[in-house]
Amino acid sequence: AKVLIDSNSLGRLINMKGVYGKSQMISFNQTDWRTNREASGGGILLDQGIHMLDLMRYLSGENFTEVFSIIDNAFWNFDVEDNAYVLMKSPKGLVSQLHSSATQWRHVFNLEITLERGSLILGGLLTGSKSYGDETLTIITSDPSKDNGMPKESTSKYNEDVSWDNEI
């Protein structure tokens, strides 16, 4: 995805929308450090959502300077948020939204990146539990004057996590 974005083959970035959600706050144990604001500093946004935010910043090369958010403790009643809704804008005008959730019920990792001549969709996440589904990259190439809402797309599936091999 980074290579495609940096190549400018699909044009400039228009927006990004990411969802990183899981079904609980790691455990139902009220004494878990992740559910204690004093120990963790925050809830699902700092625990999981920060990884989506880092990915958005990495792929776009942008820092977000305008940030609006709503955090909520909609279900778990812990000392930290179980949902965070974040709307961001960079100095160059890139608008991005992020939803980090511990009430997703079905684990989800999805990042949609809209560019001038297409979109990229990163889906799934290779984890030990396999609960986030297959890791995929969908490339959509669009010509709005001809596609009539049905652009060409191709999806690649990734079966091996080499991220630890690439760590410094």
Where are these regions (language model features)?
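Predominantly a Rossmann-like dinucleotide-binding segment in NAD(P)-dependent oxidoreductases
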Residues: 1-77
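Membrane-targeting and insertion segments and their boundary/processing signals
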Residues: 23-30, 83, 142-146
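NAD(P)-dinucleotide binding in Rossmann-like oxidoreductases
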Residues: 76-81, 91-167
